[in-house]
A protein has these predicted regions:
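Mobile amphipathic helical/loop "lid" adjacent to a hydrophobic cofactor/ligand pocket
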Residues: 23, 93-94, 98, 103-202, ...
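N-terminal Rossmann-like FAD-binding beta1-loop-alpha1 element of flavoenzymes
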Residues: 31-58
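Mid-domain catalytic core of redox enzymes
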Residues: 251-361, 365-370
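Glycine-rich active-site loop/strand segments that organize a redox cofactor
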Residues: 69-88, 146, 150-162
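Short beta-strand to alpha-helix junction loop
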Residues: 84-91, 166-167, 178, 214-236, ...
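Conserved flavin/dinucleotide-binding core of flavoenzymes
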Residues: 331, 335-448
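Helical element adjacent to the flavin cofactor pocket in flavoenzyme catalytic cores
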Residues: 209-257, 266-270
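Glycine-rich FAD pyrophosphate-binding loop
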Residues: 50-74
Length: 448
């Protein structure tokens, strides 16, 4: 993967870290707790332990915190590793994050959907009533579909977590049974939620559709002003001095013991695995868990331009399914900090990881259909990201049984979005639950 944006505008705040080559500090010699992985789940777990005054060592294989939530700086542009947005209504995020410090910048509630050679504005009628009224009879969707959308808003009102009573119902089946037309599913739900689920067949559990629809309905979507990595950075700033070790990859884990790639062995009474499902399976072969399904992947191409027509901070969707680009967003319209003064940053998001050597040209061809030759000719390609392990597959399909237990066996714990639900909220919640499980094992109440 590309280099991290250490010390950049994307990395506000200063966390207390040790390089892997640094020997244990005062925390490390006394520590009885080791957390492997400083993504959102590991940081949320560390937050619980730090609030309780517990000493721990947090190991991170890479050179910065965040896991899959990372931001690079390229020529002054902030490039999130894969197109991501933040949902301010997430209950666990509201619990642990300082939104004012993140300086959240809202995204337009709705989308411009490209169908029949032009964009059609689908606006949230509650947030943008005049625009919704103006486009009330737009042929992109039927009046019945618009009414059914209001019924779905009522159905999910008040949800705080994915409902567990939908069993293994897939999202597409649920939408069809709820009364949406094939046109509405194909033109809006497939590109919009397909871009979130990273699969256009909408096989993902309808429970996640319910939960995310409720979150969008309640709080819309946004970006931190200085990039998505502002989220893990904010959590890392509160870590105790000497508790975080970067560039410290782990090769093996068992109850009471963590082995680093360097050969160093850390002993602890409590070990928390806060890594991806694939890495957890590799580190814990002794559990006998079945191999995880292949991960879902995504590709993002970033472009820069200094000449762009005025517009709203809105998501542009591929409603006709001709692809390969599923969505386009001008990130600098959402937050000007994403680009140097006088320039714009454009994100194009693709579901999957195509291996074509001509991918940029294929993307440009599609963008010319969308925005015109004159506009796209001025775009400069900055970087392409292929995120092959963007989301775990299995957890997306089956949510009815509830979250996985944090404790694997006495002294050994797990957390991550693959243990809860695949979202920022799920990662934060799973990390907190792992921290609370450690506190229970210690016979002490969790701080909050």
């Amino acid at each position: 993967m590309p280099h991290a944006a250490s010390g950049s505008r994307a990395c506000k705040g200063k966390s207390h870290v040790h390089d892997a080559g640094t020997k244990f500090g005062m925390n490390d010699q006394a520590s009885r707790i080791v957390i492997v992985g400083a993504g959102l789940a590991g940081l949320a777990c560390a937050r619980v332990l730090a609030a309780a005054g517990k000493q721990f060592t947090l190991l991170e294989a890479s050179n910065a915190v965040g896991g899959r939530v990372r931001t690079d700086v390229v020529d002054g542009f902030l490039l999130d590793r894969g197109f991501q947005v933040f949902l301010p209504a997430y209950p666990e995020a509201r619990r642990v994050l300082d939104y004012d410090e993140l300086d959240l910048r809202p995204i337009y509630r709705g989308a411009d959907v490209f169908v029949k050679n032009r964009f059609h504005r689908m606006a949230d009628p509650l947030a943008h009533p005049l625009t919704a009224m103006k486009n009330f009879r737009d042929e992109i969707v039927t009046l019945r579909d618009k009414w059914t959308t209001l019924l779905l808003r009522k159905e999910v009102f008040g949800l705080q977590e994915p409902p567990r009573d939908l069993g293994d119902t897939e999202s597409e089946d649920y939408l069809r049974d709820f009364g949406f037309s094939e046109v509405m599913i194909d033109r809006f739900f497939r590109p919009f939620f397909g871009g979130i689920f990273l699969e256009k067949d909408l096989r993902t559990s309808a429970a996640m559709l319910h939960f995310l629809f409720a979150m969008f309905d309640r709080g819309g979507s946004a970006l931190p002003a200085h990039g998505m990595q502002s989220i893990p950075n904010q959590l890392a700033v509160a870590l105790p001095p000497g508790s975080l070790r970067l560039n410290a990859p782990v090769s093996g884990v068992r109850a009471g013991e963590v082995t680093l790639d360097s050969g160093e062995v850390l002993h602890a009474d409590h070990v928390i695995i806060a890594v991806s499902e694939e890495v957890a399976h590799r580190l814990l072969p002794q559990t006998g868990a079945p191999a995880p399904l292949p991960s879902r992947s995504t590709t993002s191409l970033y472009f820069a331009t200094d000449d762009l027509p005025p517009g709203d901070p809105i998501l542009h969707l591929d409603g006709d399914g001709r692809g390969p680009v599923n969505s386009v967003t001008v990130l600098s319209r959402i937050s000007p900090h994403y680009a140097p003064p006088g320039q714009h940053l454009i994100s194009t998001a693709i579901i999957g990881s195509p291996c074509s050597t001509e991918l940029e040209q294929v993307v440009r061809e599609q963008m010319r259909r969308w925005f015109g030759e004159t506009v796209v000719a001025k775009w400069r390609h900055l970087r392409t990201y292929q995120i092959r392990h963007a989301q775990p597959e299995g957890r997306q399909l089956k949510l009815g049984a509830g979250p996985l237990n944090a404790m694997i066996e006495p002294g050994l714990y797990r957390c991550g979005d693959w243990c809860e639900d695949v979202s920022i909220n799920g990662a934060l919640l799973s990390g907190r639950r792992a921290g609370e499980a450690v506190m229970r094992a210690l016979g002490e109440p969790s701080p909050d």
